[in-house]
Amino acid sequence: ASPRSAQEAWTERGDAPIVITDESRLLIEEISIAARDSELVDQTSGVSARVAISAIELLASNLERRALTTGDHPVYPRLCDLPPLLPALTGKLEMVYEGEQQGPEVVARKLIGMAVRKLFEGRFPELERDVPANPDEPGPYAPILTWFAAGNAVTLSDEMPFAEYAAELARVPGLEALAAPLGGAPEQRAFWSELVLDGLHQSVKLARHDLDSTVSYKELLKFQLVKPPRRGPRRGTGEIN
């Protein structure tokens, strides 16, 4: 078994041991920081520590559910566990007028995206933003972007057994090489692999589509870069820009 830090908590919930990792706590804290810095959130009402506490409680419940449905033992957080945490944000944050116009869930997803991007930029190599995603792009992200440019896609879910989830991530060349230096258990490296994909999405290099409990990543087409801004979520779709 891999070593675990003192801050990393084992939580016994019934017969399903779960692990709330340092990186998942850090990401939730970054979401709280993004909320405290956001002009869309009413700062006069304060951003309570209960936001992070509530998010961790919801995360633990989601991990427990996955342990019971998949039989995985123990269960670790994934980035695709974040959508079920939206109630922790929408129910605890008060929006200013502009935030209310966009909708609490849209604002909450933006805060999550900001936190993911900050963690991505802090842990992984700098992304060459001005170079198009093509086979000649230099750097560690070239194999990943080239693979997606060939028409491939990845679909992940918080309901997948870990073996299936890890196998889906392993299809993407270059992903494991980026995540491996961060160490930890295989489940933790898979978390970092997924964070790379979402970091590339937040950096406008990949498209992401949400549907029910699944998250899909695919090539970002040029026409997707020039879509007009929307005031709120599009009805009937989980697409996130």
Predicted regions and their residues:
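C-terminal engagement/docking regions of AAA+ P-loop ATPases
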Residues: 44, 64-241
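Conserved AAA+ ATPase small/helical "lid" subdomain
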Residues: 2-76
